[in-house]
């Protein structure tokens, strides 16, 4: 669909990215937070550093319209997986988000023989694209005991809610579930 709009995708690894492309990627990243009233916590310096030190593990999927950069998906590559993390665009185009964030990631994994593609957190819309909910964990330590207890209490409640949400989302799976 994006080809019909004369949009082309250009995949650039961190070590190949020019200063201009790094600045563009950071700008697209920040624009998403600006639109959603969030705070883009990753600086341009961070982007420069990961491109310098992580090289081929940083994968930018730039979208171009008439040689103008209009969007970018920012992914990170592990030994056998590609992890979608950030996205941003100048203007909305039909199917552009899914092309850059999902279809290009899938194609990249096939080309590079990566076994796993994690398109990123959140998004019930990912079910229709074939991505089922996956439970993840994280570990954190809070020095303040009262704050720690409040977070623990919240996490206990959240765990049940997340279990129920995953169950509901799995019922929407486009795949036939074996019994």
Write out the residue ranges for each language-model feature:
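Acyl-donor binding region in acyl/amide transferases
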Residues: 79-145
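A conserved beta-strand-loop-helix scaffold within acyl/acetyltransferase catalytic domains
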Residues: 1-94, 141, 156, 173-179
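Terminal substrate-recognition subdomain of acyl/acetyltransferases
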Residues: 1-11, 116, 121-179
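Residue-level detector of functional hotspots within protein domains
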Residues: 47-49, 68, 103-105, 117, ...
């Amino acid at each position: 669909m994006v080809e019909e709009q004369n949009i082309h995708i250009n995949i650039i690894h961190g070590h190949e990215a020019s200063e201009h492309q790094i600045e563009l990627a950071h700008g697209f990243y920040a624009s998403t937070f600006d639109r959603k009233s969030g705070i883009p916590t990753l600086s341009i310096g961070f982007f420069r550093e990961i491109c310098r030190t992580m090289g081929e593990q940083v994968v930018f999927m730039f979208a171009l319209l008439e040689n103008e950069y209009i969007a970018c998906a920012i992914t990170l590559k592990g030994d056998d997986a590609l992890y979608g993390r950030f996205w941003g665009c100048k203007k909305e185009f039909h199917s552009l988000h899914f092309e850059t964030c999902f279809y290009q990631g899938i194609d990249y994994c096939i080309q590079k023989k990566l076994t796993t593609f994690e398109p990123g957190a959140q998004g019930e819309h990912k079910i229709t694209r074939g991505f089922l909910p996956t439970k993840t964990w994280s570990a954190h330590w809070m020095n303040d005991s009262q704050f720690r207890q409040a977070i623990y209490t919240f996490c206990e409640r959240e765990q049940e809610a997340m279990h129920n949400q995953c169950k509901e989302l799995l019922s929407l799976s486009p795949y036939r579930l074996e019994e």
